[in-house]
């Protein structure tokens, strides 16, 4: 058998080698939030909507100050609009990050500049040891 026949046989036997690569997010960033209060604004990002990927925020290892107080972690996704008030795309609650991790998903959003606003109890200082924004 010729070398090219071996190559063709190997490729046919392994469809994962020739299947299209799954879609990946256009961009992401990871950060840590330390002692933030309600109303804290994350860094912004530009979603060009080239890939059609959902916008998601994942939070892990959340802590409160004062320690042991009840937890609440919310993120409100906002789209920057010049001159007008920014567009609110809804709020997701991620309280699972106190146990392990949790994720909020806003689905596919239109191209534009975005940021998220943190929501927690007014008296709380929230720490999120690992935060990932995917867009």
Named regions from a protein language model:
Residues 1-8:
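Bacterial N-terminal signal peptides that target proteins for export
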Residues 8, 19, 94-96:
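Intrinsically disordered, low-complexity repeat segments enriched in small/polar residues
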Residues 15-22:
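C-terminal segment of classical bacterial N-terminal signal peptides
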Residues 24-135:
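Post-signal peptide N-terminal regions of Sec-secreted extracellular proteins
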């Amino acid at each position: 058998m010729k070398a090219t026949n071996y190559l063709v046989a190997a490729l046919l036997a392994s469809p994962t080698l020739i299947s299209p690569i799954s879609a990946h997010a256009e961009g992401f960033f990871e950060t840590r939030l330390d002692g933030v209060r309600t109303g804290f604004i994350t860094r912004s990002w530009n979603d060009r909507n080239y890939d059609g990927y959902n916008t998601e925020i994942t939070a892990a290892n959340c802590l409160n100050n004062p320690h042991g107080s009840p937890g609440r972690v919310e993120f409100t996704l906002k789209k920057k609009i010049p001159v007008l008030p920014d567009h609110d795309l809804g709020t997701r609650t991620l309280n699972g990050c106190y146990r392990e991790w949790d994720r909020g998903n806003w689905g596919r959003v239109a191209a534009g500049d975005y940021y998220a606003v943190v929501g927690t109890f007014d008296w709380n200082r929230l720490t999120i040891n690992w935060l990932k924004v995917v867009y």
